[in-house]
Amino acid sequence: MQSVGQQILIRTKGRSLWWLSKCGWNICCTVIFHFVIYLSTIIFCLLTQSKILSSVDVELMNVMFTTNRATQVSEIGILPFSLLLLPIAISIGINLFQMTLSLFIKPIFSFLFISLFMLSSAYYMSPFWIGNYAMPIRYNLMHTNGMLISNGIIVSILLITASIIIGLISFRYYDIINRD
């Protein structure tokens, strides 16, 4: 923790409040970043006069992803919800986990670990690699043996909660003076 962080910690009059405010800041930044991405997409669609739809064209999905999911049209309604919120929830969970991991190892190693973990999600489809839940092409609606959206929601909630609680407990005993 650098001098600015130490000064803010002293002014907040408590480690728990400081950790929770840092988690809140992390969550707000993640939501804002995703909002900017979504807003950029909408602006691009408006500039190129592309249609912005809140539904999924099942025929196009079958052609693009070589699936045969025309019989599951009722399940497709959850896809737009998942496209918007599940990647945000997974990002929040990963960001909070990286921040918590930085309490135990140096931040650069925490970043490297999370980067390799997320990179592995691009190459291996498994519920263990939680980055798969942030990729709609890996959902069970698109892929025969794909990820369940409900599992992604549960995993993201558990990761967010565990990261906040473990970080809160660990930061109480964290030596802020003798660390890099």
Give the role of each language-model region.
Residues 1, 30-34, 108:
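Transmembrane alpha-helices and adjacent helix-loop boundaries
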Residues 160-180:
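Junction motif at the cytosolic side of a transmembrane helix
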Residues 1-28:
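Helix-loop-helix units of permease transmembrane domains in multi-pass membrane transporters
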Residues 35, 39, 96, 129, ...:
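Transmembrane alpha-helix boundary/anchor motif
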Residues 20-103, 138-157:
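Secretory targeting signals
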Residues 125-143:
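Juxtamembrane "helix-exit" motif on the non-cytosolic side of transmembrane helices
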